[in-house]
Amino acid sequence: MLRHKEPYVLYRKLLGFYPTDIHLYEQACLHRSSSICEQGRRINNERLEFLGDAILDAIVADILFHKFKTSKEGFLTNTRAKIVKRESLNEIAVKLGLDNFITYSMRTSSHNNY
């Protein structure tokens, strides 16, 4: 397989390593508005986003659980919700430059959900 150098270099710069499966990273950056059809299935980032959200929730929950050892469940839940809310994640994505990786359709009126 011939590797296209540019995406690998960009991901290396952002992540600190070269991705093993570049197609998985490309799919993660494919907004629903730019879905492609493959074997009768619409391919985009939604399933990977679901998985990533679940993993992020678990990681943040673990960090908060260990950092705030005497805090009640309500505090931990509210704090986690504030950290992983869409607006916070969008702001982080822009600061990291992830918005430059997202492929979306120009027809979409709002594309700030990375």
Segments predicted by a language model, with ranges:
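RNase III-family endoribonuclease catalytic core
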Residues: 1-114
